[in-house]
């Protein structure tokens, strides 16, 4: 992996998203500005960490970061805009919510939303940039908790296990029970469950 070279600036925010692929729930984004004086050991892509480690880092990031913020786009917005544009909107909301305005924003992936400050897309940024790793952890722990809460309301779908992703079990239950109000109606499997496509 090529080492990431940071821009020559002080206040750098990292941004990442969780939940582009699931059939249910919001896409959740986070923006984090870390404090160089309070380093956090063990930051990595949230998907590569155990749930226990993610939860511990989640608390440490919230305590030590100079600023952090969540952004989201709800299923209705995803259906109206499409998942890419909804994700960009959620990222804009996360950056706008920071209590400190960053000088530079590093975004995980290959494209940036329109922002009022300089930004750069970093491919595999969640493994290469500490601020993006921190954002991925904040976003994933938040969205996983939302799926666990949704699981209590709709236990038959197994949301706590698959987090809304289109697993065989989820697709089976979607076919059996139909979609909830939280499902994304523009996604193919949900359309099929509604009888909108063959």
Curated annotation (Swiss-Prot):
GO terms for cellular component: cytoplasm; ribonuclease H2 complex. GO terms for molecular function: manganese ion binding; RNA binding; RNA-DNA hybrid ribonuclease activity. Keywords: Cytoplasm, Endonuclease, Hydrolase, Manganese, Metal-binding, Nuclease. Its EC number is 3.1.26.4. InterPro entries: RNase_HII, RNase_HII/HIII, RNase_HII/HIII_dom, RNaseH-like_sf, RNaseH_sf. Its cofactor is Mn(2+); Mg(2+). One of its GO terms (biological process) is DNA replication, removal of RNA primer. Its main location: cytoplasm. It catalyses: Endonucleolytic cleavage to 5'-phosphomonoester. It is found in: Cytoplasm. Pfam families: RNase_HII. Gene3D superfamilies: Ribonuclease H-like superfamily/Ribonuclease H. HAMAP family: RNase_HII_B. Belongs to the RNase HII family. Endonuclease that specifically degrades the RNA of RNA-DNA hybrids. This is Ribonuclease HII. It comes from Enterobacter sp. (strain 638). The gene is rnhB.
């Amino acid at each position: 992996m090529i080492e990431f070279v940071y821009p020559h600036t002080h206040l750098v925010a990292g941004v990442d998203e969780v939940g582009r692929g699931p059939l249910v729930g919001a896409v959740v984004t986070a923006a984090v500005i870390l404090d160089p004086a309070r380093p956090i050991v063990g930051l990595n892509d949230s998907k590569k960490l155990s749930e226990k480690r993610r939860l511990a880092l989640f608390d440490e990031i919230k305590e030590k970061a100079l600023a952090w913020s969540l952004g989201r786009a709800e299923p209705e917005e995803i259906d109206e805009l499409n998942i890419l544009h909804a994700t960009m909107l959620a990222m804009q909301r996360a950056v706008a919510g920071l209590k400190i305005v960053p000088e530079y924003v590093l975004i995980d992936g290959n494209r940036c939303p329109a922002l009022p400050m300089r930004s750069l897309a970093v491919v595999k940024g969640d493994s290469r940039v500490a601020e993006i790793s921190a954002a991925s952890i904040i976003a994933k722990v938040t969205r996983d908790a939302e799926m666990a809460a949704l699981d209590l309301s709709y236990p038959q779908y197994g949301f706590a296990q698959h987090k809304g992703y289109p697993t065989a079990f989820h697709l089976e239950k979607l076919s059996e029970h139909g979609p909830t109000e939280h499902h994304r109606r523009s996604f193919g499997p949900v359309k099929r469950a509604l009888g909108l496509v063959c």
